[in-house]
Amino acid sequence: MTSDPLTGTPAATPASPAPLPSLRLVDVACRRGDRILFSGLNETLERGQLLWLRGGNGRGKTSLLRLVAGLAAPERGQILWDGVPTRGNEHFDRALVYIAHANALKDDLTATESLAFLARVHGRDAGAPALRAALARLGLAGRERTPVRSLSQGLRRRVALARLALETGPSLGVLDEPFDALDVAGTATLHALLAAHRARGGSVLLTSHHLHLDGAAAGAGFRVLDLDLLPRDGGTAP
């Protein structure tokens, strides 16, 4: 133990930083209608990691994202954030950034107004400077006042993805097909955004049918979860 050089009293030991919370899925099963899409899912997503969900059509990729986002409940199992169930968990709600496959933009609003609306709906109150900066990071500088109806599908996707650029802390990005409709430049921009998000301790759970993701592009902490390898009904995988 060290001591204060002036008083000779023992110096306080610096407290270790609290570990950043992680997402845990414990024996999760997902039902849609009368079918079990998958069961027996046990997975942990640590801060700074990116987990890419893969699987054939109808295997439950989007359904799993909806379970994590709290839009549906698992048939069995638990979804935990820092060891606490995510349902009704205010800490998790504040950390979650869910961007669905549909952009959920209103044609009559401008890009800035749309981003502000999306932020408010999800509990974020972003000021004008933050909105401008987020849109600029997605390559939308100069289009802030452009009505959504005048934007291409790729640019609309960038507006929706700018929600992640508003984040300043280690949040959880849950993204359904984020690369859809993006051109080469937009794809590179999204890769940079994901890297910056993870560098500050954020984590990412996403689906993508596009071959834009690999270990080299995503860097350390990149993992793949193949839902095709999970059993549908608690038995063996197909």
Outline where the language-model segments fall:
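Conserved ABC ATPase "signature" region
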Residues: A116, A128-R143, A162
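Conserved structural motif at the start of ABC-family nucleotide-binding domains
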Residues: L23, L37-G40
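Conserved ABC transporter NBD signature motif
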Residues: P74-F92
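Helix-to-loop junction immediately C-terminal to a conserved catalytic motif
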Residues: A69
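Q-loop/switch helix immediately C-terminal to the Walker
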Residues: A102, D107-G123, A130
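ABC ATPase nucleotide-binding domain "signature" region
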Residues: W52, R156-A165
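The feature captures the beta-strand-to-loop junction immediately N-terminal to the Walker
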Residues: R54-G56
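Catalytic Walker B motif of ABC-type/P-loop ATPase nucleotide-binding domains
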Residues: G173-E177
